[in-house]
Amino acid sequence: VQLTPSFTFRDLGNNLDYFVELGISHLYLSPVLEAVNGSNHGYDVVDHSIIRVELGGEREYLELLKRARSSGLGVIQDIVPNHMAVNGRNWRLMDVLRRGKESPYWDYFDLHGDKVKLPILEDSLENVLSRGLIEVKEGQLVYRDWRLPLSRISQDLKETLNSQNYVLTSWRESPSYRRFFEVNGLIALREENDWVFRESHGKLLDFPLDGLRVDHVDGLFDPAQYLDRLRTSFPGIVLLEKILSFGEVIPFKVDGTTGYDFMNYANLLFTFNEEEMDSLYQQLVGKVDVESGIMECKLLVMETLFRDDLSRVARALGVEFKDLEDYVSCLHYYRTYGQVDQGCDREGKISRAARENLVAYRRLEQYMPAVHAKGYEDTFLFRYDRLISLNEVGSDLRLYSLHPEEFHGFNQGRVGTLSLNGTSTHDTKFSEDVRMKISAVSERPQEWRDKVREWHELLRPRVDPNDEYRFFQVLVGSYFEGFTEDYRERLKSHMLKTIREAKVHTSWRDANGEYEEEVMRMVDSAFNDSTFRRSFLEFEGPVRKDGMVKSLSLLALKVLSPGVPDFYQGTETWRYLLTDPDNRRPVDFDQLRRLLKGSRSLTPDMVSDMNDGRIKMYLTTTLLRIRRENYGEVFRGDYEGLRVQQGLCGFRRGELTVIVRTMASKEFTVKLDGEYTDLVTGESVKEEVSIGQLPRVLRKVS
């Protein structure tokens, strides 16, 4: 649940009955500590000792926890140990700025050097001063909305600035503190210090919570030590926001992760016709070497975003910056956890340095997630557009599809785990329904090829063919409620973010207004051209139906596979969401209540016309009920993958047999070894069963 100033503890409390009727067991809350005013996510904490006032404060939070418990709902709370906001209301940081190294909070933050370098200026200090934008007022340094403390004041403004414990610089420069990724406004903490852990966690650990979700654990100096402290202090469930690569295993004990691994294994079941999709993409943009493309993007962000940080680490390790670049750019996962990857350390230089200075190597490890996230997830995923339903957090774009046997092997390793089965989150590039709809395009490659060519001729955009191709995929995947003005603006915002993240023709640091305007014209042309819209809708209609079938199949896999199903922000019905901030759009709980009320039993019209979302709501409540009623089998029971024909995925959990369509454009028939009851439809089937638009969940009749 995304809590915001416009959706508070009280608002959530007023909807608890809805979650209970839906079949939810636990609420999973976004951060609740005091944050920057107006924040719509809460990861920009300013005070660890206060429950956020804009959400209702401590009294309303306690009341929510009490009401949730009395309703039979547990609460998992998201916490942010890695960083805080650089903000005037962060009084610990303000004390550091005022007192420098004399402040007791100097070691609260991950600082370097003798002064704090604050890159908050819109231009160079000299230019900002010449424009009169900095002044001393009421004993504070005032710049725009900033109010900074002063340790010394003299008659000369430059002299005053030079005598402070901080230095103001342009936003283009790197700060003298470790950040969350490259975000200058989020300063990292030194949780390896026991007193920092106690002070930053003390408030929340006093509340009666069932579990914690730990944000960005890979950014911490020693994640294993941190988790030991957390387990000593907190008896409940601990879930990590740990993004695992394919085959990667967490090297320390934990209850589970937030489930990006499940999302990506499942995602690869739904894509087909790799050769044809590859051929079309190569015709449009030329041949792309994925491996070298990923490395190029990582090298780019190391040079442009993290050069100062990594140069400092290289000096501490006693290696050349180039050696460090080669090593980190080679890694295909977030962090090495103290073990140097020998395959990427080709000359052994990093291994030798790590043996001599493990502390410095761990400092390097704290930057590995930033390089991977910014280089791969926030650059390459916006450059390589072969089939963008695959471009997700934790993905591996060297892979196109997955054989069900590999999915079954993954699932067998998760039996009994509390890891989430996530399919949509605030970090996913697209919501599950968008991904499944785009994946449905892969089932009709020739028709797609023809449409792409036709649409290009109709619009004739003056943009990179790669950006044009992505736009067509985004439009197909996210179109749902018509060519409205709201949708037009959402697409423009998404495409602007896409091209800036790709860092090819424009970027956040160096915007190319002329190119960006051409991309906006492309969006407008698509909306304004009636011939294009007619052609688009001819294609979108059948793809929408196939995408919905795939979404329902994914829903069944999520709920009945090993792990804990995770539902994000209204995804119990159709939610066609784009990259953040679009995926934080508010949820209309009144509409969800109406849908829930209208989907208590299965009717033919819910299947014949799925657009109103009742079928997904019905399937969600039905599958969650099946899970509750068969909890032992679904949670700890044996898992057996079934051998089924291509286009299907099936498995057994105890006495339950689950069969879903991963290929939506055709129907299938499966032979049975007796009589079964379908727990989704209620019908009795024997000898053989058709796998139509709904997943099959079968129990054998004794």
Residue map of PLM features:
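C-terminal beta-strand-rich structural cap/linker in extracellular carbohydrate-active enzymes
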Residues: 684-702
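Beta-strand-rich binding/interaction modules
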Residues: 631-633, 656, 665-682
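Conserved phosphate/anionic-ligand binding catalytic regions in large, soluble enzymes, centered on
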Residues: 333-335, 418-434, 471-480, 554-582
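Amphipathic alpha-helical
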Residues: 522-540, 613-639
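Acidic/aromatic-lined carbohydrate-recognition and catalytic surfaces
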Residues: 1-183, 189, 198, 206, ...
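Extended, charge-enriched "interface" segments that sit outside catalytic cores
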Residues: 346-347, 419-422, 434-544, 552, ...
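Carbohydrate-binding surface patches
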Residues: 615, 625, 641-671
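Polyanionic (Asp/Glu-rich) segments that form extended negatively charged tracts
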Residues: 223, 228, 234-236, 265-320, ...
